């Protein structure tokens, strides 16, 4: 995806939790807007969430663009929480974007700002280590109280 013109390094990293059951879905979330309709707020992540969501239903296309999408549901409660861009369309690839293909509906998840290693400052995308989602045990095993705050 085209990210050379746009910079997302100053965006806050969020922990994304399911609104229905409070399950942690991702420790690498970012607030975003839908490329095809910038009035729609959502969250996104760059790494496939592990042991948190799975595909549900059939692939579909939107009326606004030609991206091929598939819904994702929370593994704990079964509610649809977002979608995965299976095949992005050329207009979305050429747009200013963050390179993320995993999207979460703002009506289905809530975010918690993730702190840096000092535990004081909000972690920014420019300082985020490039590691696998599944190896980030400290963040994925956060307490229920942390997710509820």
Swiss-Prot record:
Keyword rRNA-binding on entry: no
Record text on subunit structure and interactions: Interacts with UNG.
Species name: Homo sapiens (Human)
More details: Highly homologous to GCUD2 but localized to a distinct locus.
The protein, known as: Protein FAM72A
Pfam families linked: YPEH2ZP
Function: May play a role in the regulation of cellular reactive oxygen species metabolism. May participate in cell growth regulation.
Cysteine pairs bridged by disulfides in the record: none
Gene encoding the protein: FAM72A
């Amino acid at each position: 995806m085209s990210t050379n013109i746009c910079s997302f390094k100053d965006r806050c990293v969020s922990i994304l939790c399911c609104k229905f059951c409070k399950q942690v879905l991702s420790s690498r979330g970012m607030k975003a807007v839908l490329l095809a309709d910038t009035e729609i707020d959502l969250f996104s992540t760059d790494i496939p969430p592990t042991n948190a969501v799975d595909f549900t239903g059939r692939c579909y296309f939107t009326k606004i663009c030609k991206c091929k999408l598939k819904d994702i549901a929370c593994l704990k409660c079964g509610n649809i929480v977002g979608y995965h861009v299976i095949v992005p369309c050329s207009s979305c690839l050429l747009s200013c974007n963050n390179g993320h293909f995993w999207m979460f509906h703002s009506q289905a998840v809530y975010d918690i700002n993730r702190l840096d290693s000092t535990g004081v400052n909000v972690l920014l995308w420019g300082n985020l280590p490039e590691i696998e989602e599944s190896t980030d045990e400290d963040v994925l095993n956060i307490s229920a109280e942390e997710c509820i705050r």
